[in-house]
Amino acid sequence: MSDILDKIIAVKREEIAAALESAPLEELKVQASARDSRDFVGALRDKHAAGHAAVIAEVKKASPSKGVLREHFVPADIARSYAQHGAACLSVLTDERFFQGSARYLEQARAACALPVLRKDFIVDAYQVLEARAMGADAILLIAAALDTPLMIDLEAYAHSLGLAVLVEVHNRGELDEALKLKTPLVGINNRNLRTFETTIDTTLGMLDAIPDDRIVVTESGILSRADVERMEAAGVHTFLVGEAFMRAENPGAELARMFF
């Protein structure tokens, strides 16, 4: 199979070049400074302290591997449904080319509820970090497979300077070793291989022994049932990023409650 991640990164670099023309850095800085901030990490810890799973509920219309997940897609309604049914935070896809996402979707979802919001995208440049703050994100995703370690460290530092939390995502032990050089407590283990899009939740279970106790493990992708949730919780994982299972349900928030609470 062709390397999907490399294709996505190449497109991101093209998008950044175009965005710099249409929305210069100084303009973005003004927009970013006007945004309020919600505590992403704190929202997860509050759920843990109350004895609940912390669910980062995803607002996602489509994916390259599965196509359109939800035809009737209204981000504000989905966000409200998640908030009403116990989500800790939101994750909103902003990639347009591959996931049919949009910055507008993030803005609409955040305006509809009080939950902190993660910008889910393929970030490879500081411009996108500032862009995330300007659109209202409270956290960004850094994907270890897409970044070398010095750049990842620099992007994290810039994000923190803007008041953004960082979720660093890994898929194997080599990436984990590099991710642990960051300061963020949030370590996401993606059960989906971003180079092949194959998925198994054993990926998370096989890496837990290498993660320090002071980090919050976020299991991502492939959590599709209550049985998957119970398997993770039995292994000590209590933070989940889930999209597909909710997006395919008639009522995303009700499905969240059914799976987790």
Curated annotation (Swiss-Prot):
Keywords: Amino-acid biosynthesis, Aromatic amino acid biosynthesis, Decarboxylase, Lyase, Tryptophan biosynthesis. Coiled coil: none annotated. Pfam families: IGPS. PROSITE patterns: IGPS. Transmembrane segments: none annotated. It catalyses: 1-(2-carboxyphenylamino)-1-deoxy-D-ribulose 5-phosphate + H(+) = (1S,2R)-1-C-(indol-3-yl)glycerol 3-phosphate + CO2 + H2O. GO terms for biological process: L-tryptophan biosynthetic process. Its EC number is 4.1.1.48. The keyword Amino-acid biosynthesis applies. Pathway: Amino-acid biosynthesis; L-tryptophan biosynthesis; L-tryptophan from chorismate: step 4/5. One of its GO terms (molecular function) is indole-3-glycerol-phosphate synthase activity. InterPro entries: Aldolase_TIM (IPR013785), Indole-3-glycerol_P_synth (IPR045186), Indole-3-glycerol_P_synth_dom (IPR013798), Indole-3-GlycerolPSynthase_CS (IPR001468), RibuloseP-bd_barrel (IPR011060). Gene3D superfamilies: Aldolase class I (3.20.20.70). Belongs to the TrpC family. PANTHER family: INDOLE-3-GLYCEROL-PHOSPHATE SYNTHASE (PTHR22854:SF2), TRYPTOPHAN BIOSYNTHESIS PROTEIN (PTHR22854). This is Indole-3-glycerol phosphate synthase. It comes from Burkholderia pseudomallei (strain K96243). The lineage of its organism: Bacteria, Pseudomonadati, Pseudomonadota, Betaproteobacteria, Burkholderiales. The gene is trpC.
